[in-house]
């Protein structure tokens, strides 16, 4: 049913462009022939007109799968498929459409249209008018609207940009990224977090594991070749993960998306058009996208034009890394956003070194119940990972020993006084250029 709703919306959403004023604007010869001055005539947005052309009964006859509850999400998606302020009354739209739209509609569609249905405008899920009364709509109707509107925009943007496909080919069959990660890890035993996420690839997860436990690779194994978004709080972190996927794992179908991602594409100087790569990233078309969280969660504020993010996340996997780094305001948006994504059918994995218990409390308030909507597992007690070795010396430091240790790993030396630290540094500096 969802596919059918999206297809029907794609077919109907631009009917309104058949109106005489729009045609006269794009075709000056027509305007001259009809002695029209279209720039002096008030225009009604074509999306508003497209929504007038079908009644509830006609809508239900389009598919036996459609129900009365589908009609208003469908109509609202068509009506506002562009972000246009709506201060017209149904009567004003009806009068304008009867004069400039209805006569042209038959020529455009090849079908007889005797009536326009402006009365449905007052029943839309919402009006893009700050003075209009806000309605209470069910989560089911809201999510259906998000899906129809989001996918309609996604297809519309792709076609307008000259692309035949709205999505680049996913990695579902070859699973090249997963295979590359597995090759990289083949000489090592999978760490607990990696093994767990690989085995629970079809579930929503919260995985707590210490720094250095291979959470990034665990998340890539969890993606399992499906369309995925890997989110981080900082641009520099996003750049690092993007480089790791593209470099270490030699996976080319990965995109980077944040406020400064264009500079990264320019640095790469690839044969592919930089603009094209950036535009496809903005359209959420790549199989794997590394991005900052703000690039995806705009839809939680309900702004028209952001539905594409929720609709795309419905059939994607979302990785949220370093959730502890966000401010309370962003945490609130993330929790609300994943509650919507989960209800729509998308999947999420939160990977973190620290997961404050209060987050689980607020997730539960939004219907995200541990053990039902997601599984939580904590590997922070894993003592197999030794990141630092500390030794206290009562005697003078031996520069030769430090140089030997420094040839194998990083060594941090803390002295009692500035004078002794400076003296030791001078000795080391005279023997190696790698001292700081």
State each model region's role.
Residues 178-206:
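Conserved pre-motif I regulatory segment
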Residues 225-249, 256-261, 355-360, 418:
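Conserved Walker A/P-loop ATP-binding site and its immediately adjacent core
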């Amino acid at each position: 049913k969802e596919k059918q709703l999206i297809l029907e919306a794609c077919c109907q959403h631009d009917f309104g462009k058949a109106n005489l004023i729009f045609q006269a604007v794009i075709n000056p010869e027509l305007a001259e022939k009809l002695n029209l001055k279209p720039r002096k005539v008030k225009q009604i947005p074509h999306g508003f007109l497209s929504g007038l052309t079908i009644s509830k009964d006609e809508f239900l006859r389009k598919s036996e799968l459609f129900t009365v509850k589908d009609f208003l999400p469908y109509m609202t998606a068509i009506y506002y498929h562009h972000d246009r302020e709506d201060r017209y009354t149904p009567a004003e739209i009806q009068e304008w459409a009867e004069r400039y739209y209805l006569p042209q509609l038959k020529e455009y569609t090849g079908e007889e249209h005797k009536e326009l249905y402006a009365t449905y405008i007052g029943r839309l899920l919402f009006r893009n008018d700050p003075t209009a009364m806000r309605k209470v709509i069910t989560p089911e109707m809201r999510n259906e609207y998000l899906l129809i509107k989001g996918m309609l925009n996604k297809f519309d943007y792709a076609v307008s940009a000259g692309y035949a496909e709205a999505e680049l080919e996913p990695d579902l069959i070859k699973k090249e990224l997963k295979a590359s990660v597995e090759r990289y890890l083949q000489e090592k035993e999978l760490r607990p977090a990696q093994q767990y996420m690989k085995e629970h690839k079809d579930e929503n997860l919260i995985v707590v594991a210490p720094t250095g436990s291979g959470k990034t690779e665990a998340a890539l194994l969890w993606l399992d070749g499906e369309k995925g978004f890997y989110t981080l709080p900082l641009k520099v972190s996003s750049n690092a993960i993007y480089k790791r996927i593209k470099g270490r794992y030699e996976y080319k179908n990965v995109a980077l998306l944040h406020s400064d991602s264009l500079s990264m594409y320019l640095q790469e100087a690839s044969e592919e058009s930089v603009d094209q790569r950036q535009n496809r990233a903005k359209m959420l078309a790549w199989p794997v996208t590394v991005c900052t969280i703000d690039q995806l969660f705009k839809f939680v504020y309900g702004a028209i034009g952001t539905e594409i993010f929720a609709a795309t996340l419905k059939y994607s996997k979302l990785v949220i890394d370093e959730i502890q780094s966000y401010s309370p305001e962003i945490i609130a948006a993330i929790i609300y956003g994943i509650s919507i994504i989960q209800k729509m059918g998308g999947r999420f994995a939160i990977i973190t070194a620290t997961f404050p218990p209060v987050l689980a409390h607020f997730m539960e308030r939004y219907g995200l119940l541990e053990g039902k909507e997601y599984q939580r597992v904590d590997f922070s007690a894993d003592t197999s990972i030794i990141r630092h070795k500390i030794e206290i010396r009562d005697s003078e430091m031996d520069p030769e020993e430090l140089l030997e240790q420094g040839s194998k790993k990083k060594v941090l030396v803390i002295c009692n006084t500035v004078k002794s630290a400076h003296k030791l540094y001078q000795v080391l500096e005279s023997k190696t250029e790698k001292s700081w």
